[in-house]
Amino acid sequence: MRSSPSTRTICAQCLSRNRHFSTTIQRCAPRSSTPNPPSPPATGYARLTNRGLISITGIDSTSYLQGLITQNMLITNDPNRPTRRTGSYTAFLNSQGRVLNDAFLYPLPQAEGTSPDEHAWLVEVDKSEVTSLLKHLKKHKLRAKLKLRALDEGERTVWASWKDHSEPRWAAYNLDSQSFSPFASSSATVTGCVDTRAPGFGSRLITPGEGDLTTHLAGAEGEGYGSEVDLGSYTVRRMLHGVAEGQSEIIRESALPLESNMDMMRGIDFRKGCYVGQELTIRTHHTGVVRKRILPVQLYEGSLGDLESADMPVYDPSVEVELPPSGSNISKVSARKGRSAGKFLGGVGNIGLALCRLEMMTDVALTGEGTQYSPDQEFKVSWTGAEDGSSESGEVKLKALVPAWTREYISNGGVKKNQGRNLELEGQRARELLEQLEEEESSR
């Protein structure tokens, strides 16, 4: 979420406060041979083995990407509109404005012997989608002077790193910076960006080879990253923050970018010109109301009264829950038939993500017409064995939760209310923060 001087910000320390949130799910024998992953530490990093990389190099690579992604490849605050040299969250859409792939885009340093205009980029995407995205990219290549290549296994490694106790300024890293990476003393072969999908969510880094992340970070910089955790713990942390990732959660050619929170996550630049899928996205942003959004959910059994009030779910690795199949409909417990309240997207243990009708499953009011929400209303997901390929049917209750930053973004009208902010001043402030970070690193 982009902040302005008139908008309250949420620091990382507030997110890490202990929340007492009880569930009454029966603790039974494990329903699978794999135990739930442990809770994520306050500081740590994870190797994202479920992500793949595509290289795009050539003199036309920047203009080519500008016409395909939701993010702006140019620095709009500069009258010369130079090419952005920072990584960012973005998405590829189809012509109907639906998501093909959520992605991260990273610049690579200029290779020796190439012209200054010959930029190189890495696209990070769901590993199972690399072939499909590469096909999409080749379809739009036409006569553009560039090369496309899927990176080999082990050629580079994708990492997520976080420090829940870190200063809020890390979340203010500006996409218009001229720096390749917010990590000033990193090796020239390392690229990365701040992960803007939730306040204080952490950083994304790409390193060469398969070695440990800290081997690529010199001196004190490498000491503050904590210890490596497995992919499961990263997934838990991501779902606790309500961050969907990959096409098992952001369904290809079905999900809409605003319903997937890409506007709130700074993955869309509404000021940029034409790109594939822009029309529906811009029209919804300016004239429509986003009635559904992806939210974190708490899975439980028993009564709703056993759940204490909170704005984020609480993960308990000892709780075993049989998860519904992805895409299962959410309905009211009291209703046999009626309008679907949303769709379950995925989960780990007793937490998950769901696409929720806000005015039905939460107290968020989008218009002045009132809502269908009742604090006593319970919701469930029911499924049959035929849906998940098993011989058994199942049912689990869930409660949608609205993180504080999501509620604030919606109540403020999102970026529409912030259109009058001083973008030049914001860019200058971010550059000053980067310079301060570089000075601190060099003085250590």
Curated annotation (Swiss-Prot):
Its main location: mitochondrion. One of its GO terms (cellular component) is mitochondrial matrix. Gene3D superfamilies: Probable tRNA modification gtpase trme, domain 1 (3.30.1360.120). One of its GO terms (biological process) is iron-sulfur cluster assembly. Residues 26-45 are annotated as: Disordered. It is found in: Mitochondrion matrix. GO terms for molecular function: transferase activity. It comes from the Eukaryota. Pfam families: Beta-barrel_CAF17_C (PF25455). Residues 1-28 form a transit peptide. Keywords: Mitochondrion, Transit peptide. Belongs to the GcvT family. CAF17/IBA57 subfamily. This is Iron-sulfur cluster assembly factor IBA57 homolog, mitochondrial. It comes from Aspergillus niger (strain ATCC MYA-4892 / CBS 513.88 / FGSC A1513). The lineage of its organism: Eukaryota, Fungi, Dikarya, Ascomycota, Pezizomycotina.
